Amino acid sequence: MRMTILFRWLATLWFAGLIIFSAGQLAAQTEEKLLDDINQLPEAERQARLVDSAKKEGTVTWYVAMNRAYAQDLINAFEAQYPFLKVNALTGGGGALLNRVLAEHRAKSFQYDVFNTRSMTINTLKKAGAIMRYRSPYRNSLRDGFYDKEGYLNGIFATPLVFIFNTKLVNRKEAPASIEDLLNLKWVGKMAVDDESFDWLAALLDYYGEAKGTELATKLGQQKLNVRRGPTLLTQLVAAGEFFVEIDGHHQEAIAKKKAGAPIDYNFPQPFVPAKSLIPIYMSSRPPHPHAAALMADFLMSKKGQEIMSGHGRWVGHKGITAKGPDDIGDRKVVIPSPDKWGDRYQELIGLYNKLLLRQGGS
């Protein structure tokens, strides 16, 4: 008798859990389908539907892994375009916000609408069910590599990594211009690299293949690289003359410091320009304000939003926006690390980086 009661109790709990899980899955599918259906409408009708429904929602929550001042520029422009919406922004580091998103999803406490962080997180977020597909028509304006086929990945910017050099210490004609130039013995002990530039190595391995890429990284690691943390700090140290060359400088840092009068210049690496992993705008699988979330994601992919980011020195996803003069990447080959390949192998990538370039834990 007791076993029968226990069995019925367990069966009831299992069935209740199944109902809750199914309801959650259905809600996520319903919100994704809701926006999918709206995205099939003619442009003017689509926009009107989003705006009318967003007015009732009144707010949108954005988890922002971005410079606060840069984020505020975007928020100000968005709220000016949609004065009936208030952006609730939570800024923080990408890792901390990722953990928050995952914790909220596990607790079924759905707080955020949109979230930007590095694309290497996509597999983690997909497996957790924390993001949904958003197949906005604004995806059509994005460069190759800034979106996926499914609709989870909608890239807003990436960071090209360049060779920054001190112009008082290095003549432009002698500055390294290619990956293989870095292996010249004259640069031994004179180059600097960030201790977390894992995407630089991923791009190298993606371009050359893992065998040749590993060989080049091993040789580069033998050049006695000076290791620091933080792209801004590294560029400042190069400008101060502490190091001759920074091999993984952020493009926007180089532009900003050069314009400010620092004694630096830079080269786009050949035969390819490595890029820090793409920054997409993810859509919550359970957005509290789905229509406002769609407007926010659209704005960040739109020419207006992308021009603001370009003004911050970002290499943006919009095909119609380029930098001016020598700061334009032009038709150079840019390699953005594959999130599908490295997302599940990121710990392995970190280990390779520490071993090959930083010479830690092995030779």
Where are these regions (language model features)?
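A bilobed periplasmic-binding-protein/Venus flytrap-type ligand-binding module shared by bacterial periplasmic
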Residues: 162-169, 205-207, 277-289, 308-309
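Extracellular/periplasmic bilobal clamshell ligand-binding domains
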Residues: 324-363
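A ligand-binding cleft/hinge motif common to bilobed small-molecule-binding domains
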Residues: 121-124, 244-263
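Periplasmic-binding protein-like
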Residues: 144-145, 158-159, 187-196, 217-221, 226-228, 299-323, ...
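Short amphipathic alpha-helical coupling segments at ligand-binding clamshell hinges
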Residues: 74, 212-219, 288-300, 308-311
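Extracytoplasmic ligand-binding site segments that recognize negatively charged/polar headgroups
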Residues: 61-76, 87-105, 109-242
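Bacterial N-terminal signal peptides
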Residues: 9-22
